[in-house]
């Protein structure tokens, strides 16, 4: 029978309709033939069988209706077998049948399959796949080095189908198995119920074979299995079908966990992390690809088994070497930033190159673009950490240990030498970018309890910071992973060992980790920013000078300026991402609340109201490291300098900061370190409204801050705290205290000026002055009296120093203009230039400070008079004012006429105006006017006449000039009278003269230990600065001195006699 007849017979068979196609029916018949052949071979020959029509028809391919009907008893099984074959072909895209495609139907058959020739030969006549050989077939497919060379058409279609070729000929076996898994999933949803177990079995085969591939990757030639896994995940993220891939991976991971005989699960997965490490380390912050890789890691940190491998994988080889943490996978991620990778090297840096050629708007756009990436980047890192903390106690312990060990190994970043030796620094410690990013992520973890009224916030237990070294098991039990905090200096010394709880909550640990990270990172970078800013200013001045003088160094200076500006803009951008700043402000405001609650002895979880006077019970502060408060202050100062708008938009939170400043600035019992307390004055300056704010109609600028500051409930206590710290920093015990105190007091002057302009603060200051006036001879000098004494000390020293520096600058400028420097060697000339620059910087500093001190005295004397005119202070302030007038309006003023007053912040007109204002404020007091002529060193009627002339020259108001002229006349009259009296008393014996001042004593007193008699006003002035006997250094207070009544009476009798003698002579 011909093929055509055979086909016709089958097509006319009514049972053929049960098959999907004519080819299927033919295949069924072939199977029947094979089975019958096998049966006939096994049975002995029989005459009856020789005429068997079925056998004959099979031999002759004669498929009659009767013959097919007789074999239908196995039709259902055979049909199922054919369907299994097709299903296997659809799932795995493999086949054993390479017959003519035209004889195959396209119904249910893939258009392209890989023909497994060797297996087909091995199975001889079987050209179908079933559940008994599918595993072997799949394995054979996986071993093919180039499956694309084995593709065959399964249908007669001639249409080019590239996707079918790609899918069937997929060379990467991991991707191939994943695709098989997806096709098996689809089959499960479509196949009849009787085929469902086989579809599930095929799906399981993809998983088990993927497990095998990962366990024994070496047997698959030219296949980088782990690369393929990463690429598959990467493609899934970019193609938005990541959940499908993770479903597949979950099953593979489960299979690997159950079979660790060949390789452990970590051994299998570590190469994946190696690949991620190698790829991520070369990526930049603003590359989209980076975020796809981070999403892969986010999945790994959510998957419990992968997360365990991850936390083990990131452990550094040497946990004591801080820099090693940066080389781990997590460390590499944390090191990605817009900061320079190699400090000082701007070549190949991708941000803010040639900034002078960019407009401010272009720079702002680039900054905003970087900030968008930073916000996304920090969110990814935060989610990774959060996943690990929440996944299991094991991963939580591991990641917290990593963080704690990392911070401890990098503790040296805060040492002074570290900043002075950068080449060693970067070999020993992780980078600034590392800690900036880690800080940003940890800040996000803290946000749930970073609310001022959060009950969780007050569950922080400061004794955590006092714990000594623990072993790993103890750390796990107690939830303590930070190391070395017990060696940190705390706010106050501890009196006794604290009572430690059995364990600590995550709030405590998070706060400690975050604050220390900010201290190592943000705090240090802020210092860098300030130095860069200063260097930029110096370079700008030098560049401008070089351009004006046509110096060949101009180009070099410009290049230096460009490079430094790139560093500055990169650093500023890295530190000012808005969400990070807001999160940090939330934390620091919460820290202010926490420290205030600890300072008033609150050990509960609910905040209590602040009241004055402060209650006792603040021992918990003995376990709070100073860097908690230092971070708070440092961050607010940073905002004032580089992101002031954040302060204004969060003004309502600043009341909590004012509470903190009020308590700690004025309380040495709660904050022992005078330097830290002095820094709080700078913090106060940072959060208060700007004095020199330029109005901006689009922004409320300082409105909100002004409202908070002016309506502050504890204004009197804040004013007193400020004055107290002004006094306290005079004696810090530091060998450099003399130089330091001026820097510490710099921000205090504008604060005092602002306070004086606000009614509540001004009245508080006046109350302090009134108290001082009534207690001048108290055992301890009143606070405000000591403040005024130090203020005058500063004014005298600062303006005197400024005058000296200006005189030196004047001389050097004359020498330079005359050409005297031209003949010098280049080195000698450089030294001269450097000396002139140094004098200029010193003169500028002293001028700024003296302007502030004299200005402060000018506004204080407008309403506070009694203290200034008291003998304790009057002589000193008068001698100071006259001395300065002598230099500013007298013949000596020519020595101060440098080329450019503004370059050195020298404001002689303002100084003269302020000094005259002080005179006019106090001139109504007769005693004060009478004391002016007693200044024999500087006072003369001519001096005041010269002052009037200068006031006219600088166009001061006429009423001021007239008032000062009248005052000068009154003082001159009193001077004439005093001169006559001095002539009368000129021959006073030494017994009547003050041994210190050599003036006639008015109120002699005896010092208890040295038994020396001095004038009361003299010793009172001395004790304001030094509470010791000036003759033997024994401790001394005003209440210990005794009046020398007998000597006083003798002096008064002698004066009366001299006066009587004079009258008789007249």
Curated annotation (Swiss-Prot):
Annotated ranges, domain U-box: 987-1061
Classification via CDD domains: RING-Ubox_UBE4A
EC number per UniProt: 2.3.2.27
Modified residues (N6-acetyllysine): 386
UniProt record, GO biological process: ERAD pathway; protein polyubiquitination; ubiquitin-dependent protein catabolic process
GO cellular component entries: cytoplasm; nucleus; ubiquitin ligase complex
Keyword set, alphabetical order: Acetylation, Cytoplasm, Disease variant, Intellectual disability, Transferase, Ubl conjugation pathway
Domain of life, per lineage: Eukaryota
Subcellular location: Cytoplasm
Pathway: Protein modification; protein ubiquitination
KW Nucleotide-binding (keyword) present: no
Task of the protein: Ubiquitin-protein ligase that probably functions as an E3 ligase in conjunction with specific E1 and E2 ligases. May also function as an E4 ligase mediating the assembly of polyubiquitin chains on substrates ubiquitinated by another E3 ubiquitin ligase. Mediates 'Lys-48'-linked polyubiquitination of substrates.
Domain notes: The U-box domain is required for the ubiquitin protein ligase activity.
Protein name: Ubiquitin conjugation factor E4 A
Originating organism: Homo sapiens (Human)
């Amino acid at each position: 029978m011909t093929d055509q007849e055979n086909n016709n017979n089958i097509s006319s068979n009514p049972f053929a309709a049960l098959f999907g196609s004519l080819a299927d029916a033919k295949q069924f018949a072939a199977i029947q033939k094979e089975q019958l052949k096998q049966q006939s071979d096994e049975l002995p020959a029989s005459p009856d069988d020789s005429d068997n029509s079925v056998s004959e028809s099979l031999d002759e391919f004669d498929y009659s209706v009767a013959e097919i009907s007789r074999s239908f008893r196995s039709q259902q099984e055979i049909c199922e077998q054919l369907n299994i074959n097709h299903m296997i072909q659809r799932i795995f895209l493999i086949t054993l049948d390479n017959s003519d495609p035209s004889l195959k139907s396209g119904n249910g058959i893939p258009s392209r399959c890989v023909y497994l020739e060797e297996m087909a030969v091995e199975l001889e006549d079987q050209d179908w796949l079933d559940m008994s050989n599918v595993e072997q077939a799949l394995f054979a497919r996986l071993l093919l080095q180039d499956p694309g060379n084995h593709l065959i058409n399964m249908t007669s279609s001639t249409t080019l189908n590239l996707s079918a070729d790609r899918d069937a000929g997929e060379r990467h076996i991991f991707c191939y198995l994943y695709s098989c898994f997806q096709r098996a999933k689809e089959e499960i949803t479509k196949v009849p119920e009787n085929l469902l177990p086989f579809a599930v079995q095929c799906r399981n085969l993809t998983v088990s074979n993927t497990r095998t591939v990962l366990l024994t990757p070496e047997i698959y030639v030219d296949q980088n299995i782990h690369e393929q896994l990463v690429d598959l995940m990467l493609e899934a993220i970019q193609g938005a079908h990541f959940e499908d891939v993770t479903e597949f991976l979950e099953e593979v991971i489960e299979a690997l966990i159950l079979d660790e005989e060949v390789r452990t699960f970590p051994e299998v997965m570590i190469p994946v992390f190696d690949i991620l490490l190698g790829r991520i380390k070369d990526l930049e912050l603003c590359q989209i690809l980076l975020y796809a890789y981070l999403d892969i890691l986010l999945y790994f940190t959510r998957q419990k088994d992968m997360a365990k491998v991850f936390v083990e994988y990131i452990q550094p080889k040497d946990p004591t070497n801080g820099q090693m943490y940066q080389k781990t996978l997590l460390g590499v991620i944390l090191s990605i930033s817009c900061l320079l990778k190699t400090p000082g090297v701007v070549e190949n840096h991708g941000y803010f190159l040639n900034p002078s050629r960019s407009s401010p708007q272009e720079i702002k756009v680039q900054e905003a673009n970087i900030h968008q990436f930073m916000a996304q980047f920090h969110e990814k890192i935060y989610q990774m950490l959060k996943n690990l903390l929440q996944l299991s106690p094991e991963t939580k312990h591991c990641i917290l240990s990593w963080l704690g060990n990392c911070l401890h190994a990098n503790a040296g970043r805060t040492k002074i030498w570290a900043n002075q030796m950068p080449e060693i620094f970067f070999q020993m410690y992780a980078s600034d970018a590392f800690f900036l990013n880690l800080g940003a992520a940890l800040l996000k973890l803290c946000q749930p309890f970073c609310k001022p009224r959060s009950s969780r916030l007050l569950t922080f237990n400061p004794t955590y910071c006092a714990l000594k070294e623990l072993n790993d098991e103890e750390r796990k039990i107690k939830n303590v992973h930070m190391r070395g905090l017990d060696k940190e200096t705390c706010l106050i010394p501890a009196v006794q060992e604290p009572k430690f709880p059995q364990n600590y909550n995550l709030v405590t640990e998070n706060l400690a980790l975050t604050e220390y990270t900010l201290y190592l990172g943000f705090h240090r970078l802020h210092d860098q920013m300030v130095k860069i800013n200063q260097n930029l200013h110096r370079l700008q001045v030098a560049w401008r000078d070089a351009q004006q003088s046509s110096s060949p160094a101009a180009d070099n200076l410009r290049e230096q300026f460009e490079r430094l500006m790139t560093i500055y803009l990169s650093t500023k951008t890295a530190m000012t991402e808005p969400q990070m700043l807001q999160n940090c402000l939330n934390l620091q405001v919460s820290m202010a609340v926490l420290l205030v609650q600890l300072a008033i002895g609150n050990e509960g979880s609910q905040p209590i109201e602040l009241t004055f006077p402060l209650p006792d019970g603040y021992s918990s502060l003995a376990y709070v490291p100073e860097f908690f408060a230092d971070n708070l202050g440092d961050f607010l100062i940073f905002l004032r300098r580089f992101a002031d708008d954040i302060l204004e938009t969060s003004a309502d939170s600043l009341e909590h900061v004012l509470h903190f400043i009020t308590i700690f600035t004025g309380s040495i019992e709660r904050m022992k370190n005078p330097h830290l307390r002095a820094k709080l004055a700078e913090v106060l300056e940072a959060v208060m409204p700007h004095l020199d704010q330029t109005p901006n109609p689009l922004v409320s600028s300082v409105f909100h801050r002004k409202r908070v500051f002016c309506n502050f409930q504890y204004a009197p206590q804040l004013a007193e705290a400020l004055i107290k710290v002004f006094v306290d920093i005079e004696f810090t015990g530091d060998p450099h205290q003399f130089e330091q105190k001026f820097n510490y007091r710099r921000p205090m002057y504008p604060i005092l000026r602002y306070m004086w302009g606000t009614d509540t603060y001004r009245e508080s200051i006046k109350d302090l002055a009134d108290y001082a006036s009534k207690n001048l001879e108290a055992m301890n000098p009143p606070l405000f009296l000591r403040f005024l004494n130090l203020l005058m000390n500063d004014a005298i020293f600062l303006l005197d120093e400024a005058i000296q520096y200006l005189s030196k600058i004047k001389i050097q400028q004359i020498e330079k203009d005359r050409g005297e420097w031209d003949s010098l060697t280049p080195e000698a000339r450089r030294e001269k230039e450097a000396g002139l620059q140094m004098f200029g910087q010193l003169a500028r500093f002293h001028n700024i400070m003296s302007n502030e001190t004299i200005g402060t005295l000018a506004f204080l004397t407008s309403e506070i008079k009694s203290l200034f005119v008291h003998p304790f202070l009057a002589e000193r302030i008068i001698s100071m004012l006259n001395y300065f007038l002598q230099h500013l309006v007298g013949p000596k003023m020519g020595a101060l006429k440098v080329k450019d007053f503004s370059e050195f912040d020298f404001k002689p007109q303002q100084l003269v105006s302020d000094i005259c204002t002080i005179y006019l404020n106090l001139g109504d007091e007769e005693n004060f006017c009478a004391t002016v002529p007693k200044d024999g060193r500087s006072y003369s009627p001519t001096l005041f006449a010269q002052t009037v002339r200068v006031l006219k020259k600088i166009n001061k108001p006429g009423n001021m000039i007239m008032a000062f002229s009248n005052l000068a006349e009154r003082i001159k009259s009193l001077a004439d009278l005093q001169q006559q009296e001095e002539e009368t008393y000129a021959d006073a014996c030494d017994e009547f003269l003050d041994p210190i001042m050599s003036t006639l004593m008015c109120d002699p007193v005896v010092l208890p230990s040295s038994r020396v008699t001095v004038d009361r006003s003299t010793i009172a002035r001395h004790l304001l600065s030094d509470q010791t006997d000036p003759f033997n250094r024994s401790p001394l207070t005003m209440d210990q001195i005794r009046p020398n009544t007998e000597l006083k009476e003798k002096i008064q009798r002698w004066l009366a006699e001299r006066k009587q003698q004079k009258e008789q002579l007249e």
